Every structure is written in structure tokens, then in C-alpha cells.
Amino acid sequence: MDPIRTSRLRAPLLASALLLAGSSVCAAEPDLETELRLNAMIGDTETAAELLDQGAHVDAPNQFGKTALMFAVEGDDLETVALLLSRGADVNARTVAGCTPLTFAAEAGHIGISALLLERGAHVHDRTRSGWDALMIASRHGITDMVEQLLFKGADPKAADREGRTALMQAASKGETGVLPLLIEGGADLEARDKQGATALLIAADQGQAGAVETLAGLGAQLDAVDALGSTALILAVGHGHVAMVERLLAMGADPNRQDRKGTTALMEAVATDHAELIDRLIAAGARTDLKDDADRTAADIAVQLGHRQAIARLAPKASKTP
């Protein structure tokens, strides 16, 4: 069989796949390497083997740096992955963006393929250009089996990306609660901070991930930790209007009267957006109306300044009773 020839049945699939594999739309026919990547992509192990026998370079990349092995990994094609590795494919090859076969497997959750890659020498600590390793990627997608496998193989749960974010922070930002205990058991630092001074709990609060906040607090994370600007989880949640998050934080004992570096309280944040429901909940939880920010303004002053009628209606009577 001529591996360059394609059947009529597969022609529509191959035509679109050729572009992904790296073939020029103007080419009369793809070269051996493009055909290899293509067949790795569609899972044709037999044809891939014949192309290699004809001299196709196993690690030839497309314009984005993707090799046949990476395409096979993405397609969850264990047979083709095994073939390419047996023919000398670089298990640690990198794309232009720094992705490796292992990071592709981690993102897709292909646990069997990642096991084979690791067995063949895949570097568990390799990073993409964004600074993400396979553990961060698997954690972000909540793939518990992959996280367990990578931790067992020595992945570092304390490693951070270019923004200073760890695998725990990645999972927290997406609300992947099932991954969080695994990372803590594996040695992740609950109170590690990114470049903005935020902990995993603060990141979860900022993203409205109430379940993640509750899980992290249950694991021992500080509820009233502050970021570089002095904001607490409660202040961040109020600022984004995350009602369910605010309710949980208050129920867990978050202090409604903490102030950030500019003196802003959670109540002032609620007033700034004229969020009546949050104003009521914060006041009911003991938020003080007499606290002032660095501009010497109370929450009522801010409400009047902004012309927020709902806030004024709720705060004016209370402000007048303040001694």
C-alpha cells in the first residue's frame, strides 16, 4: 500500500487534517513528515509505521513545533504513541509554546499515555513558556487521576508559574475541589502567594468559587488572609458581587470590618456598586457603618457621593445613630 495515497472515504477528513499537520494548501502532495503527523493525528498506526520505514523523520515538527508524537498523545492513541517511542521519538520534545507530550497528556487526561511517557523518561518538571508544568495543567482541569499519578512520579506541588501561581492556585481558580486535598497531601503550601500577594483561597474568592473557598478553609487556609493591596476574601467577593460566596465567608467567620490598605471595607465595596442585598447581609453580620477610608469617608459618605439611592436608604438612618 502506498502510504501517500488516501482512500476516497477518508479524503474529507484528511484534507482538513493536513492543514493541522502542517501541509501547505498549495502543495501538490504532502511530504513524508506531514503524512506522518497526519496519520498520528487520525490514529493510523499501520500507515505511520510504513512512513517511518520509508524514511520519515520521527520528530519532524510542524510550524508550531508539534511532532507526530504530540498529535498521537492528543488523540489518546496508545498504539501509535508506543510505535513512535519505539522508533526513537523524543519524549521531551517541545512546541514553540514550550508544550511537551506530557503536558498534552495532562491537559487531556490521558492517564494511560502519560504513564507510558513517564516510563519512557518524560520530564515531570518541564514547563511551558507560561511556566506551567503538567501538574499545574492537570490541577487546573481537575483531573484527579492525573494529579495523583504526577505527584507519585515526583511532580512538585510547590512549583509556581510566571505569575507565581501554584497547582493549588490553578485548581482553586477553577473550583476543582476534588484536586485540592490531593495537592495538600502531596505537600502543597496552603498559604503560598502569587505575584499579587494572593493565596489560593483569595484567588478562589475572587473567582467566585465558593466550594473551593470552603474546601481550602476546611484544610486550614487562613480565612482573613490579605493580598498585596490588603484585600480579604470577603472584600474581593463583595467587589465582584458574589452573593453565595459572601454568605459562605460570613458563615465561616470572615471579619466584615477588615480594611484594605486604602481603608476600604467590604461594606464600602457593596456601597460602591449599590448592591442592596450585600449591604443588608453585611450589616446583619455586624459590619460597622462608622469606619472611614483613607479619604475620611464612611460607607454612607460614599453612597451620597456616588448617588446610590439603595445604599443611602439603608445607611443614612444608621449613620445618624452613630455616636
Curated annotation (Swiss-Prot):
It holds the Pfam family Ank_2. Keywords: ANK repeat, Repeat, Signal. PROSITE patterns: ANK_REP_REGION (PS50297), ANK_REPEAT (PS50088). This is Ankyrin homolog. ANK repeats lie at residues 31-60, 64-93, 97-126, 130-159, 163-192, 196-225, 229-258, 262-291. It comes from Allochromatium vinosum (strain ATCC 17899 / DSM 180 / NBRC 103801 / NCIMB 10441 / D) (Chromatium vinosum). Residues 1-28 form the signal peptide. InterPro entries: Ankyrin_rpt (IPR002110), Ankyrin_rpt-contain_sf (IPR036770).
